[in-house]
Amino acid sequence: MRRSHARSRVKNSSSSKSDMDPIKFQIRSGNRAPSSSSTYTLTKPNSKHAKSNLLLTVGSISVVLGVLFLCYSILFSGGNLRGSLRYSVVIDGGSTGTRIHVFGYRIESGKPVFEFRGANYASLKLHPGLSAFADDPDGASVSLTELVEFAKGRVPKGMWIETEVRLMATAGMRLLELPVQEKILGVARRVLKSSGFLFRDEWASVISGSDEGVYAWVVANFALGSLGGDPLKTTGIVELGGASAQVTFVSSEPMPPEFSRTISFGNVTYNLYSHSFLHFGQNAAHDKLWGSLLSRDHNSAVEPTREKIFTDPCAPKGYNLDANTQKHLSGLLAEESRLSDSFQAGGNYSQCRSAALTILQDGNEKCSYQHCSIGSTFTPKLRGRFLATENFFYTSKFFGLGEKAWLSNMISAGERFCGEDWSKLRVKDPSLHEEDLLRYCFSSAYIVSLLHDTLGIPLDDERIGYANQAGDIPLDWALGAFIQQTATETSQHAASGNLHWFHALFSNHPKTLHYLIGIPILMTVLVYLVTKWRKPQLKTIYDLEKGRYIVTRIR
């Protein structure tokens, strides 16, 4: 009985094993031998297949949506590629004031389109210039902050982060020592970094006088429609600022490399002579005259007598030094207490012109080139047409001269003004500050001495025109800097070929790239979580009565 029973048990065990083995095999390799008795083996492969199809479908949809979003960005919302308005900000750190320029422009057919009027251009100037804060660099932050707020009011807030702001300081800052320059620039960088605009430290700098002249030439020829055309049909620029004068024009004459600049627009290359004559601006030259007068080194401007009476030929007769003028001259004065008693206004235009010429020729004996017109600096012969800007224009306008007035007209106007009694001049122009009114005698003489006596422009030559704008475009070097910078960047992008649109879109709109990558990833994650949530939780148990495994769903 025991043996029989034992055999029976073994037989039953063998029978059970026979029943169980297929099920075990199906669990391990359900793809090879599916069984209708096992829910697990029937549903598992179909679940995997369905899940893969679902993920593939959702992934494809995500990619399609991303591509559609990209196309939409390029054609519509990424309008920088299709002509929507961009902005740029340039701050001109001049010698007498700081001016901010806010530009709006478009890119059409891969080229920048500029319109310096209406909503596309705004500017604001505050006094004094940055160089006035040499003893208090932190004081520069007040005016710079006000200028930045002005710009932020002209640029939509959503575009601040992609709007470049640059500060370019000129002659006033160039006169300062480098450590002082850096302190003021450090304050400027701190203000611009916190402005909300796109800014880098190197975008706040003191530019060279040569750069300033080139930028002025660029905006002048852009305004006249000659930029990008025949070099021989371009117009030269002569600027008379407060601290410096700039001369820039196309020249075929061989010149030392330090005076030569080469720039390109489109397929045209221009070889320019460009130089800034520091200390030869109108205000700086007038101060030189005063310095020579006070030091008694300038015989034509100073006529000392035994009573030490100093005569200024460029001051209209009847003029007496006021407190402000004495304060301005305090740095040059050796005997301040006696200045008021020893000063005499000469009111002599001819002597004033001679004094101005002496200032312009100062240093000629040190010339190391074949020809030097101003000081010891090489200057080629002027050719073509010229625009005389800034103080050339202001002086011409003050005397009521037209844009094409001859230099002989300037002489006549200067002679009348210098010879007039000061009291009568004050009555004619009561709104002008006394110091500004005083300078017009010297200015008229200095202009003739610079353009005719020094640069050789005939007195009746019509090649020269006095203007501060051409059409409705201001002839401001800052506009030229903006034009050249934008044109250069655009041409560089165009040179990169098919990647231009990609760079333009994603460099200016980084959020577009984030969306393009993020949307498909987000959708894929969401689908994964949903399928994970909807995936049935299965539990496998062994049924002793039926002698098989049973797979059940857990809720």
Swiss-Prot record:
Keyword Nucleotide-binding listed: yes
Origin superkingdom: Eukaryota
UniProt-annotated catalytic positions: 212 (proton acceptor)
MF annotations from Gene Ontology: apyrase activity; ATP binding
Pfam families per record: GDA1_CD39
UniProt subcellular location: Cytoplasmic vesicle membrane
Tissue specificity remark: Detected in mature pollen grains (at the protein level). Also expressed in the veins and hydathode regions of rosette leaves.
Keyword Signal: no
Skewed-composition ranges (Polar residues): 28-45
Keywords, ordered alphabetically: ATP-binding, Calcium, Cytoplasmic vesicle, Glycoprotein, Hydrolase, Membrane, Nucleotide-binding, Transmembrane, Transmembrane helix
Sequence ranges on the Cytoplasmic membrane side: 1-55, 534-555
Reactions catalysed, as given in the entry: a ribonucleoside 5'-triphosphate + 2 H2O = a ribonucleoside 5'-phosphate + 2 phosphate + 2 H(+)
Bias kind Basic residues: ranges: 1-10
Transmembrane annotation, as ranges: 56-76, 513-533
Extracellular-side positions: 77-512
Glycosylation sites: 267, 348
The protein's required cofactors: Ca(2+)
GO biological process: anther dehiscence; pollen exine formation
Membrane association type: Multi-pass membrane protein
Binding residues for ATP: 89-99, 236-246
Main location: membrane
Family (UniProt): Belongs to the GDA1/CD39 NTPase family.
Name recorded for this polypeptide: Probable apyrase 6
Source organism (scientific name): Arabidopsis thaliana
GN (gene name): APY6
